[in-house]
UniProtKB/Swiss-Prot annotation:
Annotated keywords: Carbohydrate metabolism, Cytoplasm, Hydrolase, Magnesium, Metal-binding
Gene transcribed to yield this protein: fbp
Annotated GO CC locations: cytosol
Name the UniProt record assigns to this protein: Fructose-1,6-bisphosphatase class 1
PROSITE patterns: FBPASE
Domain of life where this protein originates: Bacteria
Subunit structure, as described in the record: Homotetramer.
Annotated binding of Mg(2+) 2, by residue: 117, 120, 280
Necessary cofactors: Mg(2+)
Organism: Flavobacterium johnsoniae (strain ATCC 17061 / DSM 2064 / JCM 8514 / BCRC 14874 / CCUG 350202 / NBRC 14942 / NCIMB 11054 / UW101)
SUPFAM superfamilies: Carbohydrate phosphatase (SSF56655)
Binding sites annotated in the UniProt record for Mg(2+) 1: 93, 117, 119
Length: 334
């Protein structure tokens, strides 16, 4: 079978066979993400026709106004994972605390926990901008057969066993890694099947796109200001192109394909940064590194940060390796 004609299901089965002692649990998690993503995709594509755009009237733990689609996507992913009894715990941007999944026999025997942002960029849904789902999977630390604890979720990113995102745009794609490269699958809406469309995805070593909210320029650290000036300076290979959508998944996806850097630094308005380490930065960092890119907080590797809280925020510099390293040079000289 031609590589690009493979369905996601076939790809998962083939890769599971490559591991002698694989139990299939991780494969079932990816399959559950696939199923939930199709349900959410259907609702996202109908958002302008039904009463599901706009604010839900409540705030999440971050103090952000929840969108109706945030709430819907959160429920879909959580219920899909719980009903299939394939994880022992779930943490979501939309929930204050993690959820313990007992299983029908109350045995707590599953090996993995999942952390997710069920609908990244949802504040843009009203204006028809691409949104996405981000997920990260860890093997639990506490003994199998016992309820999960915060220790199972507060792991550094280097312990991730899988991570990925779904982008709901002009086409719907699921991109993920299990530590052996990055592959992208595009949904054929006519038959509801994901097909391998982007095998072995790689960040270009360099790029000419920088993605940062320049409206916050006056609030940025001097190192970030200096890097932005560097990107704008007219040289042989510059100025770079500024592209910022405001949806992490969409900005990251474009930069991985075309080459670029995404920056969300600390600022005088957000002293710790805005993006969440566990279910935004860690999974994107894992994907970036598997695709030959780099992800740091401006000074050190994102995936080596030891989390201290579930909704911890960090600054984020992610993209083509040489561009991230150049940004780090400016941060170090600050």
């Amino acid at each position: 079978m031609e590589e690009r004609n493979k369905t996601l299901g076939e790809f998962i089965i083939e890769n599971q066979k490559a591991f002698q002692y694989s139990s299939g649990e991780l494969s079932r998690i990816i399959n559950s993400i696939r199923l939930a993503a199709k349900v959410v995709n259907y609702k996202v594509n109908k958002a302008g026709l039904v009463d599901i755009i706009g604010a839900a009237g409540e705030q999440n733990i971050q103090g952000e106004d929840q969108q109706k689609l945030d709430v819907y996507a959160n429920e879909v992913f959580i219920q899909t994972l719980i009903n299939r009894e394939i994880v022992c715990g779930i943490a979501s941007e939309e929930n204050d605390d993690f959820i313990t999944v007992q299983g029908s026999d109350n045995c707590h025997n599953n090996k993995y926990v999942i952390l997710m942002d069920p609908l990244d960029g949802s504040s843009n849904i009203d204006v028809n901008v691409s949104v996405g789902t981000i997920f990260s999977v860890f093997r639990r630390i506490t003994p199998i057969g016992t309820p999960v604890t915060s220790e199972d979720f507060l792991q550094p990113g280097i312990n991730q066993v899988a991570a990925g995102y779904v982008i709901y745009g002009t086409s719907t794609m699921l991109v993920y890694t299990t530590g052996f490269g990055v592959n992208g699958f595009t949904l054929n809406p006519a038959i509801g099947t994901f097909y391998l469309s982007h095998p072995n995805m790689k960040f270009p070593e360099n790029g000419n796109i920088y993605s940062v909210n320049e409206g916050n320029y006056v609030h940025f650290p001097q190192g970030v200001k200096n890097y932005i000036k560097y990107c704008q300076r007219e040289e042989e290979d510059r100025p770079y192109t500024s592209r910022y959508i405001g949806s992490l998944v969409a900005d990251f996806h474009r930069n991985m394909i075309k080459g670029g850097i995404y920056i969300y630094p600390t600022s005088s308005k957000a002293s710790k940064g805005k993006l969440r380490l566990l279910y935004e930065c860690n999974p994107m960092a894992f994907i970036a590194e598997q695709a030959g890119g780099k992800a740091t907080d401006g000074f050190g590797r994102i995936m080596e940060i030891q989390p201290t809280e579930l909704h911890q925020r960090v600054p984020f510099f992610c993209g083509s390796k040489s561009m991230v390293e150049k940004a780090e040079e400016f941060m170090a000289a600050e």
